[in-house]
Amino acid sequence: MDSLSDIDGDFDGRNEGGSSSDYRLLGRQITVHQFMGGGKAADLLLWRRRHLSLGVIIISTVAWLIFEFSGLPFLSVSSDVLLIVIMISFVHARVSAFRNRQLHSLPELVLSEEMVNSAAASFRIKLNHLLVMAHDVTVGNDFRLFFKVVICLWLLSAIGSYISLCTLLYIGTILSVTIPALYSKYQSKVDKCCGTIHRRLSHHYKIVDENVISRLSWSLSKDKDS
């Protein structure tokens, strides 16, 4: 969340008259790989591990086709898949033992205490941030935030009326695997285009803010005082 706040601050720090060629979507001194954490997940999303990235797309596509067109419930399909995998592994182990063949050692899946504490701390910070936002929206302290939340929820409602949750998750997975890699490849062109769009949107938002939002906020605060 801190990185997103830094980006928002970077947006606000640019004046409207700035050139779109100077615009940087992720900041001036950060790469896409660094912005995404620089770990194995970033390597996967940026196609530095092509076989894993391609595997994610294939598995996501197969899963989407199964759940979307078969009509089978998620719990039933997941249980059947796990059952088949466990049975195959068990039979393979028994056959190998019967033939006195050595099994390939499987890696142990163990979460370290440091990893769990780090994930819990990160989740706590993000959850507290969301709770603060929810409090500000419900009590009416920040009208601009309320306006943004209403627009986002309305868009989600409109999208959800046409697209199922399974399809929405599939689209999100495909976009998360393709967009970062494409942006990393065409970063300069995308930054230039986004700079132009951002400058125009900032101009229109300034007009709406001065003529509508600021007046509504002033009238609401006046009603509270009275």
Swiss-Prot record:
Alphabetic keyword roster: Endoplasmic reticulum, Membrane, Transmembrane, Transmembrane helix
PANTHER family according to UniProt: RETICULON, RETICULON-LIKE PROTEIN B16
Keyword Cell membrane carried by entry: no
Top-level taxonomic group: Eukaryota
Membrane-spanning parts: 54-74, 75-95, 149-169
Span of domain Reticulon: 41-224
Localization in the cell: Endoplasmic reticulum membrane
A Pfam family per the record: Reticulon
GO biological process: response to bacterium
Recorded topology in the membrane: Multi-pass membrane protein
Protein name, per record: Reticulon-like protein B16
Organism whose genome encodes this protein: Arabidopsis thaliana
GO cellular component terms, A-Z: endoplasmic reticulum membrane
PROSITE patterns per the UniProt record, alphabetical: RETICULON
InterPro entries found in the cross-reference section: Reticulon, Reticulon-like
Keyword Membrane: yes
